[in-house]
Amino acid sequence: VNKENESSTDADVKKLFTFTDKYKTGIEFIDEEHKRLFEIIDETYELIHDNFIHDKYDQIISLLDQLKDYTEFHFHDEEEYMKSIHYQGLEAQQQAHAAFIDKLVNIDIHELEAMDDNQQQYLLDLVNFLVTWLANHILGADKKISKPEA
């Protein structure tokens, strides 16, 4: 019975990283790029729960690099699209994007190397940050791109 509850909880948590219709902006390429961001978050979640990997440092660095590179690519695409439609909220979007990239860039790699005992907690914190930021940004800002106020 306990295992059933545990897997149910895992399934509920897993839903947080699933790209569903509620995150769709109606702009196909943006939705596809958002799906990829969710996939990177899901990979991070899977890494957290992979008990066969003791030292996850290399994988953490790889995921951070993937996230940074793909996020920069996505933000560029999204901002170019907003420019092309003369989107009024472009400046606010650029500021939010820059703050997110700044957070990723300023992760202290030396601190990561020294955190053998805290890698699990670091990954949990990272996933929490990613999920919260991405969900709030898509629902609060990106969905407005396809429905600009008149």
Where are these predicted regions, by residue range?
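Small-residue-biased structural context
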Residues: 2-150
